Amino acid sequence: MFSKSVTLAQYDPDLAAAIAQEDRRQQDHVELIASENYVSCAVMEAQGSQLTNKYAEGYPAKRYYGGCEYVDIVEQLAIDRVKELFGAAYANVQPHSGSQANQAVYASVLKPGDTILGMSLAHGGHLTHGASVNISGKLYNAVTYGLDENEVLDYAEVERLALEHKPKMIVAGASAYALQIDWAKFREIADKVGAYLFVDMAHYAGLVAGGEYPNPVPFCDFVTTTTHKTLRGPRGGVILCRDNTHEKALNSSIFPSLQGGPLMHVIAAKAVAFKEALQPEFKQYAKQVKINAAVMAEELVKRGLRIVSGRTESHVFLVDLQPMKITGKAAEAALGKAHITVNKNAIPNDPEKPFVTSGIRIGSAAMTTRGFNETDARVLSNLVADVLANPEDEANLAKVCGQVTALCDKYPVYGN
């Protein structure tokens, strides 16, 4: 029998200490990694619930196990809420990750060797959009498009490649592209060659939910997203469709093809996050995310830094560090010493290796969750610039760290 009175700290002090240290780090550091965010206490409560004990292979009302009457309610709540959130007719909330959601979409209508057309990883795409090191680039014949000379998504190239290669599926979406993507244009190109259109909106989903980024669902055959990042939920994935045409194929692609039992505690946490995203205050959050990102990009430009694509129209942007003669790896380390967390990131046509890079990626989702406004964003961007101007000056880093600490103390992640 398990006792509710025994705490993690009592049973496993080493693990509890590591968790406490991470909690402290999240409080004391400003999080600017674009794919990270903070979830609510309600989301964490759901994910830490007894639902983790329940196996539920199958789908609501069609399970292979008994005792699923209550987890059926949980999953149906998640399905109904995410459909309402994005105006979808179909939703599968079981994918354990965005990558598995993407695999399921491919598997539902493609055969090995079929051609897909996706955004180049080197220009801001994602591994799962056909990168050679990913299963999507091994199973399928992947052709890639990129950015034009102005670092804007090259729709003319997309159309030219589509007409030349006749892909069975066109993949849109990105992991490091700051501007808005024209879903209608992608639909037009896909229709010209009879291709399926699949959008991975993992990075932009929270902005879409908040009305601050175009919704791809009406234009696409398939849409996937992660449930974390800007959507501010637990780590996981979702598949959405504008109609039910592919329901049977998608459901069987997830179970039994790619996964076994769904993670019911995570699905419960997804349901909570979807409810939060349906509230009016989430729209204000999404609006502030965009404002903060734009302010930071503008301020960094004023300080002499080069922003890839020149600006941002979302939550994310890339900083090209080549003019400053500093690598992304070195910048990430220096900013980390000042308690500013970013990730090194390749820029278009980057001459450096992926573990070094010539850029950093900055995102505003997590800082906005804490309560940072545009004034704070302006201050923070100048602190970033201060570090990048003198990345090896320990006194400078200590000074910036003190200012970051003051900002963090002003906006505790979870309050007292």
From Swiss-Prot:
List modified residues, type N6-(pyridoxal phosphate)lysine. Answer: 229
Indicate the transmembrane segments per the record: none
Where found? Cytoplasm
Under the heading Pfam families, the entry gives: SHMT
Q: Where is this site: Plays an important role in substrate specificity?
A: 228
User: Keyword Transcription on this protein?
Assistant: no
Statement: the UniProt record of this protein carries the keyword Transferase: yes
The pathway entry for this protein reads as:
One-carbon metabolism; tetrahydrofolate interconversion; Amino-acid biosynthesis; glycine biosynthesis; glycine from L-serine: step 1/1
Q: Which GO terms describe its biological process?
A: glycine biosynthetic process from serine; tetrahydrofolate interconversion
According to UniProt, the reaction catalysed is: (6R)-5,10-methylene-5,6,7,8-tetrahydrofolate + glycine + H2O = (6S)-5,6,7,8-tetrahydrofolate + L-serine
Recorded hits in InterPro entries, A to Z, give: PyrdxlP-dep_Trfase, PyrdxlP-dep_Trfase_major, PyrdxlP-dep_Trfase_small, Ser_HO-MeTrfase, Ser_HO-MeTrfase-like, Ser_HO-MeTrfase_PLP_BS, SHMT-like_dom
Gene Ontology CC terms: cytosol
Q: Residues that bind (6S)-5,6,7,8-tetrahydrofolate, according to the entry?
A: 121, 125-127
Q: Provide the family line.
A: Belongs to the SHMT family.
Task: Note the subunit structure.
Answer: Homodimer.
Q: What does this protein do?
A: Catalyzes the reversible interconversion of serine and glycine with tetrahydrofolate (THF) serving as the one-carbon carrier. This reaction serves as the major source of one-carbon groups required for the biosynthesis of purines, thymidylate, methionine, and other important biomolecules. Also exhibits THF-independent aldolase activity toward beta-hydroxyamino acids, producing glycine and aldehydes, via a retro-aldol mechanism.
- NCBIfam families for the chain: PRK00011.1 (NF000586)
Q: What is this protein called?
A: Serine hydroxymethyltransferase
What is the organism field in this record? Neisseria gonorrhoeae
Record gene name: glyA
